[in-house]
UniProtKB/Swiss-Prot annotation:
Keywords of the record: DNA damage, DNA recombination, DNA repair, Metal-binding, Zinc, Zinc-finger
SMART domains per UniProt: TOPRIM
Gene name linked to the record: recR
Signal peptide start-end: none
GO biological process terms held by the UniProt record: DNA recombination; DNA repair
Mapped zinc finger ranges (C4-type): 60-75
Source organism phylogeny: Bacteria, Pseudomonadati, Pseudomonadota, Alphaproteobacteria, Hyphomicrobiales
This protein's name: Recombination protein RecR
Superkingdom assignment: Bacteria
Length: 201
């Protein structure tokens, strides 16, 4: 009995779906089966949405976000506070902060973090354009909203050193106990950060 359980067309669909983040082989098979079962209502609209996205989505020349316009919708929004610049690693991080509804300023997407082990240096990231934006004036605070990883913190220190002479306040996101978090389930590093960043009650 052969290993193949379906034709090459379905195998190709599964292979492509498995390349998406968060989808392993099993999840890709489930997604493929769902698409096949609902092909009349999903395949056409999905293919059209993907074609339109491929043809119209661009990176914002100001902040690095992705959108169908350049500058992006966020950079064009005059209700945003132009004096606060939130620096993030990825567009996914930008979207996560936007979902929180807490950001009133504008963004700058670095496109990753400094990682010597992976061969990622300053020239591989959107750091020079960040320095240009801050140096142009009008920004009073730079919020370094990078991940609390070694590479993330290395990147934050590097950026801080570069903008330290530009007379802007540099802050970072607080680290510690998440809302609804139980202390017994938190790692030692998170607990230590929470203790260092404690506030009056």
């Amino acid at each position: 009995m052969g290993d193949r359980i379906c034709g090459p067309e379905i195998e190709r669909l599964i292979q492509l779906l498995a390349r998406l983040p968060g989808l392993g082989p099993r999840s890709a098979r489930r997604a493929a089966l769902h698409l096949i079962r609902k092909r009349e209502e999903l395949f056409g609209p999905l293919a059209e949405a993907m074609r339109v996205a491929r043809d119209t989505i661009v990176s914002c020349s100001v902040c690095g976000n992705v959108d169908s316009c350049d500058p992006c919708t966020i950079c064009r929004d005059e209700r945003r506070d132009p004096s606060t610049l939130i620096v993030v690693e990825t567009v996914g991080d930008l979207w996560a902060l936007e979902r929180s509804g807490a950001v009133k300023g504008r963004y700058h997407v670095l496109g990753g973090v400094l990682s010597p082990l992976d061969g990622v240096g300053p020239k591989d990231l959107n750091i020079s354009s960040l320095i240009e934006r801050v140096a142009a004036g009008g920004i009073s605070e730079v919020v370094l909203a990078v991940n609390a990883t070694v590479d993330g913190q290395t990147t934050a220190h590097y950026v801080t050193d570069l903008i330290s002479h530009l007379n802007v306040r540099t802050t970072r996101l607080a680290h510690g106990v998440p809302v609804g978090g139980e202390l017994d389930y938190l790692d030692e590093g998170t607990l230590a950060a929470a203790l260092r960043a404690r506030t009056d009650f």
